[in-house]
């Protein structure tokens, strides 16, 4: 995949070349999207809109730390939707990992989560965030046990993941109406990178065959159900709903 690769570390140690080789990235000086290695982290920038800033994965500080410490925990909608109850903490495959936010919330309340991400740039961002998270004194121990990244297309990986998870979680990209600054910024940069999720409807059936208990699909409240398959079961929040479908028991 072609993208502009920029090294701002000043280290001169060739780390960016190693990273590019690992993820199959090819430097393209004219590309509007840039993957930038800074002294702190790896980030994605839209070069023609510098005001948007860089997008990076941070499980240790910022919004994710706040959500972990002060968020709803088991009371969060995504936790309710996957069926967390009492001692039951399902094994989850997040087949549309994105920046890993929902996967992290589930891991922080005790679920084991395998994140699937097919885009090599997004996978590189996730991997960078995980490496920093794993090294953190406060969260590193449980994060290594509970949150993993698999770089693969969900459409193919969902048929051969073992062991089977109890829950498959899907949050396909859907055009956002909200004008919240964060969503707007991220979605603009993200959609410039990966384009629309045109094959998302094809994920529901393999997800239902893989999950032993349920499939959870996050949708904006104005979006039709995935693959136009309606379900009466959903956890509804302000602005979103988590549609719940039966999986395929062992």
From Swiss-Prot:
It catalyses: guanosine(1516) in 16S rRNA + S-adenosyl-L-methionine = N(2)-methylguanosine(1516) in 16S rRNA + S-adenosyl-L-homocysteine + H(+). Its main location: cytoplasm. It is found in: Cytoplasm. Its EC number is 2.1.1.242. Pfam families: SAM_MT (PF04445). S-adenosyl-L-methionine binds at residues 101-102, 117-118, 153-154, 171. It comes from the Bacteria. One of its GO terms (molecular function) is rRNA (guanine-N2-)-methyltransferase activity. Keywords: Cytoplasm, Methyltransferase, rRNA processing, S-adenosyl-L-methionine, Transferase. GO terms for cellular component: cytoplasm. Specifically methylates the guanosine in position 1516 of 16S rRNA. Belongs to the methyltransferase superfamily. RsmJ family. PANTHER family: RIBOSOMAL RNA SMALL SUBUNIT METHYLTRANSFERASE J. This is Ribosomal RNA small subunit methyltransferase J. It comes from Shigella flexneri. The gene is rsmJ.
């Amino acid at each position: 995949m072609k993208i502009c690769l920029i090294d701002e570390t000043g280290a001169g140690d060739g780390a960016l070349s190693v990273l590019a080789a690992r993820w199959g990235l090819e430097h393209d000086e004219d590309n509007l999207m840039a993957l930038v290695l800074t002294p702190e982290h790896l980030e994605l920038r839209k070069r023609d809109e510098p005001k948007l800033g860089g997008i990076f994965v941070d499980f240790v500080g910022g919004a994710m730390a706040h959500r972990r410490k002060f968020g709803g925990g088991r009371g969060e909608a995504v936790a309710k939707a996957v069926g967390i109850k009492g001692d039951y903490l399902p094994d989850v495959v997040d087949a549309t990992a994105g920046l890993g936010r929902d996967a992290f919330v589930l891991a922080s309340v005790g679920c084991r989560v395998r994140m699937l991400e097919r885009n090599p740039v997004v996978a590189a961002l996730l991997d960078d965030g995980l490496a920093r998270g794993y090294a953190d004194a406060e969260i590193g121990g449980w994060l290594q046990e509970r949150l993993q990244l698999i770089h693969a297309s969900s459409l193919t990986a969902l048929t051969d993941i073992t062991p089977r998870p109890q829950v498959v979680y899907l949050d396909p990209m859907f055009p956002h109406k909200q004008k919240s600054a964060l969503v707007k910024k991220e979605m603009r940069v993200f959609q410039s990178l990966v384009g629309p999720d045109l094959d998302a409807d094809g994920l529901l059936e393999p997800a239902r065959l893989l999950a032993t208990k349920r499939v959870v699909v996050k949708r904006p409240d104005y979006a039709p159900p995935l693959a136009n398959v309606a379900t009466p079961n959903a956890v509804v929040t302000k602005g979103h709903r988590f549609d719940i479908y039966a999986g395929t028991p062992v």
